[in-house]
């Protein structure tokens, strides 16, 4: 199963759910499609990073940097999409708490540890790490190795959201629509903070001795988690509003990128427009989720079955795709002259080959345990 997306069971309850998405006792193809698109966007973003991040994390100055802004300004919605899908399926909790944690943490943590070890071995072959570095990396798995590897930071955040599920579920079961909108409204305000901080570095109680200022508990990915539940319960945006928010958010993101490209030197400063919990990403994510949720096709042909198969293997694809990106970039980057060739071609090759590798691995004994599929 695609446990990156936090699916408890495909036979989940049908209380006030979006009729386009909900088909009791059946896979929801619209969300399978959304998972696969999110996987593609993850890979696209990680391919693109090589073109705007220098080894010292400064902004490079090559002529195609403006084009990178146009090519990459949609991709950061992928992580919020995964979180919204998780909230759609997991909230509110409908099973015993201990059983929930055992199921979730087992299916997430075992593959995570296995792939951390595999990446530690991979780094010996790919970048020349020593055996001592390998053992040091393995020993560092309980600390923060996932972040040091790079893309596995996501797992820590996902586990944190799982820990939140039994806490917020009782409130979600009894709250009114207006109350839910009130929470989401405060959270939406916090998505302006990355831009507010450009003028006011510390607001609403922020200071070095206070790690939890006024709106701290309303910030971050928990808002996307609840937004996924909100769409299930009350429905998605209209197509018209979704398109307006999606196009408007994209153009705003590109504009901020182009403006800051000439004014900042560090990647962290340039990426402010690509922050997952920024207002522009929030609007685009909400809009894109709403659009795809309206797909009525049930995937009843070979292509649809492949989409569902990809969705089932998406957690393992998330782990392995960096290895495939490195392979295809080393193989193809010199033969493809420009960024607008390199990024799409390397992304497509990595996207397809990641699925093939995981599909082959899924045939091995006990693969479900360490692949998370």
Model-flagged regions — what are they?
Residues 93-99, 170-178, 232-243, 291-306, ...:
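Membrane-interface junctions at the ends of membrane-embedded or membrane-associated helices
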Residues 305-322:
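Helix-helix packing/entry segments at the starts of transmembrane helices
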Residues 262-272, 326-345:
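Extracellular/periplasmic helix-loop-helix junctions in multi-pass membrane proteins
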Residues 237-305:
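Alpha-helical transmembrane segments and terminal signal-anchor/GPI-anchor hydrophobic tails
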Residues 1-189, 334-373:
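Membrane-cytosol interface segments of multi-pass membrane proteins
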Residues 50-54, 124-132, 196-202, 259-263, ...:
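Membrane-helix interface motif
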Residues 44, 116-117, 185-198, 247-261, ...:
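Aromatic-anchored segments of alpha-helical transmembrane domains
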Residues 67-80, 142-157, 195-223, 256-286:
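Interfacial loop-to-helix transition and helix-capping segments at the boundaries
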């Amino acid at each position: 199963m695609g446990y990156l997306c936090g699916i408890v069971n495909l036979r989940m309850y049908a209380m006030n759910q979006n009729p386009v998405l909900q088909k009791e006792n059946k896979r929801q193809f619209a969300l399978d499609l959304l998972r696969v698109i999110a996987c593609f966007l993850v890979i696209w973003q990680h391919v693109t990073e090589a073109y705007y991040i220098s080894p010292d994390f400064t902004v490079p100055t090559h002529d195609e940097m403006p084009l990178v802004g146009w090519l990459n300004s949609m991709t950061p919605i992928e992580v919020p999409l995964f979180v919204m899908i998780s909230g759609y399926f997991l909230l509110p909790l409908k099973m015993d708490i201990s059983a929930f944690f055992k199921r979730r943490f087992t299916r997430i943590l075992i593959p995570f540890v296995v792939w951390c070890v595999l990446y530690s071995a991979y780094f010996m072959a790919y970048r020349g790490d020593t055996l001592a570095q390998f053992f040091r990396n393995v020993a560092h798995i309980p600390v923060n190795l996932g972040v040091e590897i790079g893309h596995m930071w996501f797992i820590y955040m996902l586990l944190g959201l799982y820990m939140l599920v039994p806490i917020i579920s009782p409130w979600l079961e009894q709250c009114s629509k207006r109350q839910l909108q009130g929470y989401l409204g405060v959270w939406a305000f916090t998505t302006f903070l990355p831009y507010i901080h450009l003028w006011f570095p510390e607001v609403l109680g922020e200071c070095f001795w206070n790690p939890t200022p006024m709106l701290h508990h309303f910030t971050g990915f928990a808002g996307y988690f609840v937004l996924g539940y909100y769409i299930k319960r009350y429905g998605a945006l209209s197509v018209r509003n979704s398109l307006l928010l999606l196009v408007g958010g994209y153009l705003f993101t590109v504009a901020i990128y182009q403006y800051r490209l000439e004014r900042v030197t560090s990647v962290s400063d340039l990426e402010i427009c690509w922050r997952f919990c920024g207002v522009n990403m929030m609007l685009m994510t909400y809009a894109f989720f709403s659009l795809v949720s309206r797909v009525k096709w049930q995937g009843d042909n070979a292509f649809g079955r492949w989409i569902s198969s990809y969705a089932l293997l998406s957690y393992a694809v998330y782990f392995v795709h960096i290895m495939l990106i490195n392979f295809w970039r080393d193989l193809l980057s010199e033969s493809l002259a420009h960024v607008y060739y390199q990024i799409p071609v390397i992304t497509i090759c990595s996207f397809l080959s990641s699925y093939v590798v995981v599909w082959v691995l899924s045939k091995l004994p006990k693969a479900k345990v360490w692949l998370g599929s």
